[in-house]
Amino acid sequence: MRTAERGVRSRARSLVVFLGVSVLAGALAAGLAIPFAGFAGFATQKAAVSMQNLPQDLETAPLAVRSKMLAADGTWIATLYEQNRVPVPLDQISPIMRRAIVAIEDSRFYEHGALDAQGTLRALIRNRSEGSVQQGGSSITQQYVKMSLIEKADTAEQRKAATAVTYERKLTELRYAVAIEKQFSKDQILEKYLNLANFGDGAFGVQTAAQHYFGVSAAKLTLPQAAMLAGLVKNPTGYDPTNNLKRAKDRRDLVIARMRELNLITAKQAADARKAPVIDFKKIRKVPNGCANSRYPFYCEYAVAKLLDNPALGSTPKEREHYLKTGGLTIRTSLDPRIQAAAQASIKEHAKVSDTAIAAITVVEPGSGLVKGMVQSKPYGKGRNHTYYNLNVEKSYPGGYGGFQNGSTMKAFTIAAAIQQGLPLTYRINSPAQIDLSGRRFKTCSGSTRDPNYRPRNSTRSGNLTMIEAAKASTNTYFLQLSQRTGLCSIATIAANLGMYNAQTQEPLDQVVSMTLGVGYVTPLMLSNAYATFAARGKYCRPTVVTSVQDKSGKPVQTPGIGCRQVLTPAVADGVNRVLSAVMEPGGTGGRLNFGNWDLAGKTGTIQDNLAVWYAGYTPNLAAAAVVADATLPYTNLMYGHTLDGQDISDPTGSGTAGPLWQTAMEKALQGMPLRRFVPPNSKITGGDGKSLPPVSGMSPGEATDTLSRAGYQVVLSGDRVNSPEAEGTVAYTDPRTGDRPPPGSQVTLFLSNGQN
């Protein structure tokens, strides 16, 4: 008897609550003040105050939409997302899908307002009998509000409040739901709901869910497919068919039964739908997320790093990353799949994943700085023979390795400094096999520097050489003397203007006596882009990987884009191009790397003790730098004993080891491109504009020095005596020779006779 009385009292209380909620809904819809004081038993005073303080409209967070990164030709590179979602308008969602979700979640959706009074009464009676909230009874609009509040939550406390099983939360949702119903039509609300909902297994929104589970668009969903998806929304994890196929089928069949009960489908349609398989596991499509799943992971990560530096995407790196993964951005990059494939084919031909040495190549377009390709021999990943290091970029970028000493490729900047100062390509310096530079002062930007014990040697040609001859042979003693003549500050300034700096520290390259021999750490990206400046006749363009960004509505997002400036005069660059072209002529260190009818220029680079070898070269169309190196920190292992292409490296050189990588990549990359030519240097660059050197043969050293000094030249006395018909101790000849036209300020070396003809 008492039990029956309790049941009657419970049902009575539920009825009172129902009436209260109905009054509440009406009052909210009318915008009236709520007399909460008389509503005890249904909600606490705290809930009442909360309701009174809520804003009129729900501020929803922008819908998280996945972003895509594309190559220059529009092909896919990567998808970036926090939630895998592609929103679609309601007319691109099949009618059967719309009916299925309404049937199972809110069958009277188009008949009631923000509150479904019948559903709420049913839930309240259940909850009162259980003593806690057990059944939702929420309308689709209320569910949309709840999902929006969860989506908007930034903190754990906000997420907890958005999912709390309390009447206070229900009242909050109801207040917002009333505002939503005033602001949007039923179809608009349903569209928002279906695009926001979580459909399990990482699929957000009905379009992504349809593609994920069935490989079709939301517009093509069939009855059994729609029923399965509609059943997921209540519990995306519990009813996920990839986790529990039986539960997913039971839930799908329940949706089908409900649709039949509401006469939305026929009995035959229901029976046929129940017979259909829930999913075909072979058709499930996982959308790869992030750069790790990209075809070009290293390039992708570098592009993302550049995007995270862009303030147009947010005030902080964290905000930018969030926008990058939720903003539905279309990111177009400079990567050219054809050129990337050419560089990758070269790596495959000349290196193996299992090699103990590493190989890397970057290809850049002169005149734009567009990074067209970036490859390396070690694939992306963990474990044996894999790496997360990007061997082509600076250490300041996530995963950046930080470069390698670049050896004689640095001589190109010394050449540029010499030409800029008026030294012609015919400028001669006596360049012995070994030279003693101990204690010699070299001018720097802050004063001078010297090495107390420095006696460098040549590994190739020595003698009285012109700039072109010395470049062809990569004669160390020539370029060390040339760098003393130009001063290290000039070389450092030109290198910095061409984008060169220490890739380990981001500091300027050290101005040391051996600077021209390439002792600073640089990257293939840095070096290829610097050489591209020569190809572009002195126009430097910062390396660019992201060419444009559009938001989800197609509006452009500001990006740095291409940025170029003239850092060398075209005449100086033309001179550098002529000198480095000679390197690739017969007899030059790069002569074996010549191909086709292209105008080619380049420079070898071999690090002392063979820690790394380089070849950097270019045409007017493309510039590339290839490196082969030991990649074991802290860069102390020699190349000897390492393997490349499965073979032991016995004689590592820039031309013989790194050169073939460069040659194959460039030859393939240039296929189909227009043939362009370097501009020949003018006569002033080639031969100088100075007066003929006055004859001083037969003069005493003092007399010759006075004569040449008055003519504007710097005079150096060689310590070597040479065979000559001139009297012993007098001048036998000079370097440059009598009749040459070195520019004013040039160094002239006096060679004295030993008196032996």
Where are these regions (language model features)?
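Ligand-recognition elements built from short beta-strands and adjacent flexible loops
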Residues: 597, 668-757
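A penicillin-recognizing enzyme superfamily signal
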Residues: 329, 333-353, 361, 374-377, ...
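Extracytoplasmic/periplasmic proteins that interact with beta-lactams or build/remodel peptidoglycan
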Residues: 56-66, 135-143, 148-173, 217, ...
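Peptidoglycan glycan-strand catalytic modules in the bacterial/periplasmic cell-wall system
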Residues: 63-266, 320, 379, 472-476, ...
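Conserved catalytic neighborhood of penicillin-recognizing serine enzymes
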Residues: 129-154, 286-292, 423-491, 540, ...
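N-terminal type II signal-anchor transmembrane helix
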Residues: 1-68
